[in-house]
């Protein structure tokens, strides 16, 4: 059974362990260095001040996480955000990422977010298919925009309308932990 809950800064060590192989072995993330546990803890706290940061647990072990972040740092973008998901390597395609995204989207809809974006390195076809399954469509490709492991990488931007925009938009509501209760699957 998978339990999805709001992350805490104390989860940082487990999340760094999940993230580390993506940093060291892939161009899925453009970070060159694995963040420290303290840095990752800070990122969790910073995200939770405005957006959801969720973890998935199976048998008490954290096996994945997903979070939303600011799309751009201008007020007009308050109703749009970037979403990210990571699942422990070796157990992808088990429904963990899907469960995390379902909960993430539920939380973001309550916040009045209208548009979701996902930034995906070209060649990460598994992520493209995953996002398309959730209704995302490719809206842009930035050629040779990131450099990692001795080569240039293209980046795809995918977008999904989470809800129909209103005019004027409903007020954006920052994420409080009370929006999310543990959900079992």
Describe the predicted segments one by one.
Residues 2, 61-65, 153:
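Glycine-rich phosphate/pyrophosphate-binding loop shared by adenosine-nucleotide-utilizing enzymes
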Residues 67, 117-120, 137-154, 163-164, ...:
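Conserved catalytic-core motifs of GNAT/GCN5-like acyltransferases
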Residues 118-128:
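Conserved beta-strand-loop-alpha-helix junction that forms the acyl-donor binding cleft
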Residues 16-43:
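Conserved GNAT-fold acetyl-CoA-binding loop/helix
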Residues 108-120:
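Conserved GNAT acetyl-CoA-binding A-motif
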Residues 35-90, 101-102, 161-163:
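Acetyl-CoA-dependent GNAT
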Residues 3-17:
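A short beta-loop-alpha structural element at the N-terminal edge
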Residues 93-106, 129-133:
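Conserved acetyl-CoA-binding loop-helix of GNAT-fold acetyltransferases
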